Curated annotation (Swiss-Prot):
It comes from the Bacteria. Pathway: Cofactor biosynthesis; NAD(+) biosynthesis; quinolinate from L-kynurenine: step 1/3. This is Kynurenine 3-monooxygenase. InterPro entries: FAD-bd, FAD/NAD-bd_sf, Kynurenine_monooxygenase. Catalyzes the hydroxylation of L-kynurenine (L-Kyn) to form 3-hydroxy-L-kynurenine (L-3OHKyn). Required for synthesis of quinolinic acid. GO terms for molecular function: FAD binding; kynurenine 3-monooxygenase activity. It catalyses: L-kynurenine + NADPH + O2 + H(+) = 3-hydroxy-L-kynurenine + NADP(+) + H2O. The keyword Transferase does not apply.
Amino acid sequence: MSEARKDTVTVVGAGLVGSLLSIYLARRGHTVELLERRPDMRRETVDGGRSINLAISTRGLHALRQVGLENEALKHAIPMRGRMIHPPQGELVYQPYGKDDSQHINAMSRGWLNAFLMTAAEATGKVRIRFKQRVTDVDFGSGALTVHDDATGEARQEPGRVVFGTDGSASAIRQALEKRPDFKGTQEQLGHGYKELTIPAGPGGAFQMEKHALHIWPRGTFMLIALPDEEGSFTCTLFLPWQGPVSFASLDTPAKLEAFFGAQFPDAKALIPDLVEAFFSRPTGSMVTVKGAPWHAGGQTLLLGDAAHAIVPFFGQGMNCGFEDCVVLDQLLGQGAGWEQVFTDFERLRKTNADAIADMAVENFVEMRDSTGDPRFLFRKAVEKVLLNAFPGEFVSRYSLVSFSHVPYRLAYQMGALTDGIVSELSEGLPRAEDVDLKRAAELIRSRLTPFMKEHADGFRTEG
């Protein structure tokens, strides 16, 4: 069995997760055929429709560290130490992400990271990437694939091998699995779409807003965000409902767009010189939450990343979760079991965690657009900050558990509900955050959080 496990395997999808997975598999001794539907993004312009920037945090960096790629990747990252809230009127409001500046997330170019991982995969000498290869069918008995070569127009059979589906939220491998009678799943489209815009660098390549922050313009049913780029620019993303009084459907003329931005985002509008041209020429992206099971067909096929569990982008964890998939799979491969056992264990370990971060991402969307500018929300955040400083190691925010630890997502979700309850109780009737009753806080923390952390000690002891 151990010898057979070193056979050639097929990975479908050379995006972020597929490229990193190929590196992990190569390091385990496998030869990898990596099939990618798109052209080689390193040589041709690719219209992927995906966001230009992403946020990489502790889980994703850990996955890169295991294969020796973290340091190089961080050379191309910009630390974001908190949210910078742009209210409709008044002063900017800064909300730090962690207990201090050491806890930050990192803005990085999706395209740069994808190209970097492709090149690193090829550098193993055991990964061959074949582009313009579109999978149209899977034989789950043998692992044989029907592949359409978009360069030649020809279809052919790819030999039967173990197959990993990392081909994104519209995964061809998952769609084939969905035809099996044992598959149960849902796909929930968010009622909002997104459009990317750019704030260019200022004179001399200077950033025109605070560099080390994720900027948010929360406006209730819609919002604008901006992440810093290496070149001094900011990639902005406008999230709007598809339909309604304020929506992509309603902003159908340059005049309406200009008036909308002038009223809602005047400071951003002043920094986006090509607003009208960019808005009407760039694609509008959709967002989906994918849940389903099983993720595997015996020991022949396994889904990872967005193919298994696509989530909306509002916790910055889609890629981080997919990279963590690679780490968990690699750990299971190191235990020497056969493929079917590895795949079964992988799904058991990852499914509940993927569902948890999917739910948290939707909740964070509501928080970002509705609450980040709400005085009551800001007051609760101030109380939370007092508790974080007064009870280090005992009181931990959900955001910190998700972004700055390896605690399983499901435990972070459950712990977050407990901490929210404590903050709500302590905030009630409080005139100032610094007046929080620390004695009462200690009682609540030690009666609710401490027992939970002890009960799940293994999860809170994960490698950091």
